[in-house]
């Protein structure tokens, strides 16, 4: 089993690029997404740092037992995860922010209004990524994020309900499995997109 150590730096941003996943409590959705993406990036690039936080998280808790159990099916150990509350420093450091729902997007923009342009729903990135210019045709990672934002048509309310990831907290293990399967698929595509974008900047 791959053991991912969820150690936090005192200052986020040691990697060249910082990707941030955001949910509510930072106990299931965002840490699962963080783990999936970290797992996939291990063999592709070392230039990306992946973190997660919750808009209403209580600090220093662990992932839910259901999340830990489900991730074992993917050979990922989530037992070392520690919850973190979303804050200004974390938002400012992130080049790309992936929110689970539209209310999470709103919470992020309240912390830093400029972050709105680089914040997307989890399903939205995959959907828009297929619509914009090929990454290899763009000059930088930043320009790719800008293209993603432009593809939304300039609307302040982004994404669709189908782009959101439902909260499995206090629900059945089956619901956790459904969320995990979807996040795994999204992170698979996101890994390919990010790797191409980062390699473009190398």
Q: What does each of the following model-derived ranges do?
A:
Residues 2-9, 109-202:
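Phosphate-binding/catalytic loops
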Residues 101-102, 123:
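Short secondary-structure boundary segments
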């Amino acid at each position: 089993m791959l053991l991912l150590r969820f150690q936090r730096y005192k200052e986020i941003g040691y990697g060249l690029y910082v990707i941030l996943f955001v949910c509510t409590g930072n106990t299931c959705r965002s840490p699962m997404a963080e783990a999936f993406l970290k797992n996939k990036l291990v063999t592709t690039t070392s230039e990306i740092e992946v973190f997660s936080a919750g808009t209403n998280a209580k600090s220093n808790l662990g992932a839910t037992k259901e999340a830990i159990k489900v991730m074992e099916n993917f050979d990922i150990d989530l037992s070392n995860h520690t919850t973190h509350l979303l804050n200004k420093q974390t938002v400012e450091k992130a080049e790309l922010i992936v929110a689970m729902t539209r209310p999470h997007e709103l919470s992020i923009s309240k912390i830093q209004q400029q972050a709105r342009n680089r914040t997307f729903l989890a399903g939205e990135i995959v959907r828009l990524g297929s619509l914009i210019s090929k990454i290899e045709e763009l000059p930088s990672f930043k320009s790719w994020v800008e293209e993603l934002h432009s593809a939304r048509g300039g609307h302040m309310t982004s994404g669709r309900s189908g782009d959101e990831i439902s909260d499995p907290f206090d629900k059945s293990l089956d619901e956790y499995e459904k969320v995990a399967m979807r996040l795994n698929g999204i992170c698979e595509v996101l890994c390919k997109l990010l790797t191409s974008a980062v390699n473009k900047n190398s």
